[in-house]
């Protein structure tokens, strides 16, 4: 049951753009995990740039730097 939680700076994405991105992300998981479409979910969460460190980097990224499959090229 993969769930993808995309946290990002505000982009003013339309519902259609979100749908296309979600379908693309789901296709990757279907290909590499063998997941069915019904088992996948995707969320989009806009985070203001001035809140990124407190809401994303410090609680989610920093504690898992050693195990991230793709590490960011920035730090705080």
Curated annotation (Swiss-Prot):
* UniProt keyword list: Cytoplasm, Isomerase
Q: Which residues form the active site?
A: 2
Q: What class of enzyme is it?
A: isomerase
Where in or outside the cell it occurs: the entry states: Cytoplasm
Q: Which GO terms describe its molecular function?
A: intramolecular oxidoreductase activity, interconverting keto- and enol-groups
The terms describing its cellular component in GO are: cytoplasm
Superkingdom of the source? Bacteria
List the SUPFAM superfamilies hit by this protein, alphabetically: Tautomerase/MIF
- The record's EC number reads 5.3.2.-
Q: Does the keyword Cell division apply?
A: no
Pfam families per UniProt: Tautomerase (PF01361)
Q: Which NCBIfam families match?
A: PRK01271.1 (NF002324)
Give the similarity note. Answer: Belongs to the 4-oxalocrotonate tautomerase family. PptA subfamily.
Subunit note: Homodimer.
What is the protein's name according to its record?
Tautomerase PptA
Q: Name the source organism.
A: Pectobacterium carotovorum subsp. carotovorum (strain PC1)
Q: Which gene encodes it?
A: pptA
């Amino acid at each position: 049951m993969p769930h993808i939680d995309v946290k990002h700076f505000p982009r003013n994405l339309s519902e259609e753009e979100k749908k296309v991105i979600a379908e693309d992300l789901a296709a990757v998981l279907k290909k590499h995990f063998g997941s069915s479409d019904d088992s996948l979910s995707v969320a989009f969460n806009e985070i203001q740039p001035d809140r990124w460190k407190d809401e994303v980097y410090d609680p989610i990224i920093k504690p898992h730097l050693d195990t991230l499959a793709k590490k960011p090229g920035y730090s705080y």
